[in-house]
Amino acid sequence: MYGHAVSAAGSSAVTGQPLLEQIFTIQRRVKGLRSAQQSKWYRGSIIQAFVFAGFCRDESFFLFNFRPLLLTAQKGVFIMNSLVILLIAAAALLGGYLLYGRFLAGTWGIDPKAKTPAYLHEDGKDYVPSSKLTVFAHQFSSIAGAGPVQGPILAAVFGWVPVLLWLLVGGVFFGAVQDFGALYASVKNDGKSIGMIIEKYIGKKGRRFFSLFCWLFTLLVIAAFTSMVSSTFNGFTAAEDGTAALNYNGAAAATISMLFIAAAMIFGLLQKRFSMKEGVKAVAAIALLAVMFALGMKLPWYLTASQWNFVVMAYLFAASVMPMWLLMQPRDYLTTFMLLGMILGAFFGVLFAHPDMNLNAFNGFAVTSASGSISYLFPTLFVTIACGAVSGFHSLVSSGTSSKTIRNEKDMLFVGYGAMVLETLLGVLSLIIVGAVAVNGNVPDGLTPFQIFSAGVAGFLESFGVPNSAANVFMTMCVSALALTSLDSVARIGRMSFQELFAYEGEGEAPFWQKLFTNKYFATVVTLALGYVLCLGGYQNVWALFGAANQMLAALVLISIAVFLKATGRKHAMLYFPMTVMLLVTFTAIILNVVGNVKAFAAGTGTFLVNGMQLIVACFLIVLGVLVAVTCIRKLVSTVAGKAEA
């Protein structure tokens, strides 16, 4: 079936070993990269066209170790140095922010003197004026979910070149534009969600279709990410003899996460009670992280993945209904320091070890998995890598929560565009890590992307003197935090989308059923319950559909932003290309998903929980996607450019 080849393709020397031994093999390989790279003389020829290497007697200095920094040729095969990829990516992303990001801000118009929705509608719950760093922390930790780790590693079966190109082009010209555009449109429209903006500029019918689409999409996110988190927190793993063995890393990371939630609430209360400067807040946050980390390592909490499903759902309920300042904002603020530590660990690990990209550069336009299923570069690559390139979910965060806390319009570029390019950098680091541990040009088989990424970065941290147990627990905690911080945001957004879907628009008192459906507690329970049912099939069976729906959402949001920009007399032509590409990609992907599920039932291998649920959701997404796209495009064509209130 469509998408399965991506997760199954690839083989390696570590295949066949017990799970923990495979992880330790990767860690030993990464840990030894630095010393191996510094002492090894390459007998392959240096490509003269890339004279970039330096030489120095001190071989310990990472840039000067008698090593060509761009390409080496071994047995006629050219291998790229990961340091060059990292430097090119960093330069491209920084250039995109400084040049294209500022161009968009200047073209659309920023008014630093305007009162933002956070002040106009301040209520202490959703509308809360916050500092630039606090809003950035919320935006980044919410959007930097499992995607920038999961997507590039799964898509690496096509080769590192197409993955890198899509990350950079998508991140700068697709994803960051959408994130910033959604934040901009929402702030200019009283902090309204994309659905309500569609109602204002396109019509109520378009808003209803879009709200339903968004709600269905949040169910997929809840299902996929809950399954990932519960699997990561699983306190048990299969031993070689088939019995259950204790998984300390997962159990300790789970305890830290639970303590982390309590610490976030304490931190939120302290922020509410005392006016802390940014420096004091940062020190307090890092101190709390250290205490929670130390306690969690001493008190591992052993539960099964099924039990963790219920714990995660209980947390999501609380996060969905509590005031922003009490849980989500402080949690995201604390999480950002941890994620930045992870990114810096990976960044400096690549900087000092600069391993070769052992992945093949390009494996062709079609790859075949071990089971014989085929995945095509188009559209698979573009829906497998969502977060890190372009993700419709980001627009829901931008317009659903971040826009209500921006205290100055000039912060929007840093929050919207800046958070996205940082996430793209995380995607590039994920690609480099899987490239470093690849064997014979292929992705290590038998391990999840999270396990590959965690083991790789933990190996880098060990080479810097961090104890093995601490490095592994820290990375397990980080990758679970990636999914958890997106989960709490999407649970809140899903609840709000459900409420918008049944919002009362008549005069007088709303009927009882409508009051019930717009009640935040009822809406949260319904959303989480259906998300839980979908997660029972495992994230592997939801991911392909999630990616396609995510990208379709991005296409619909880009069209909606274009309508808003045109209606308000702002330039919008720069959105035509990305929205057209995403429409082609997503409809192709979802149609292929439907075909694959139908074939599974025809062959007698399909099950209702997996294939049946996917088929139902996919058909709904196609119908709703067509309705929203047609409605928005008609309005875009018919709208006369003018100057509206916003």
Regions found by a protein language model. Name each.
Residues 350-367, 421-456, 489:
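Extracellular/periplasmic helix-exit of transmembrane alpha-helices
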Residues 131-147, 305-322, 334, 345-355, ...:
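Hydrophobic, membrane-embedded alpha-helices of multi-pass small-molecule transporters
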Residues 268-273, 287-310, 318-320, 325, ...:
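Hydrophobic alpha-helical segments and their helix-loop junctions in multi-pass secondary transporters
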Residues 204-219, 418-424, 471, 500-536:
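Loop-to-transmembrane helix boundary motifs in multi-pass membrane proteins
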Residues 81-98, 155-186, 195, 254-260, ...:
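Extracellular loop-to-transmembrane helix junctions
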Residues 146-153, 170-178, 182, 186-190, ...:
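Membrane-helix boundary/coupling elements in multi-pass transport proteins
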Residues 102-128, 154, 164, 168, ...:
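Flexible loop linkers connecting adjacent transmembrane helices
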Residues 78, 95-149, 336, 376, ...:
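Membrane-interface "cap" regions at the ends of multi-pass membrane proteins
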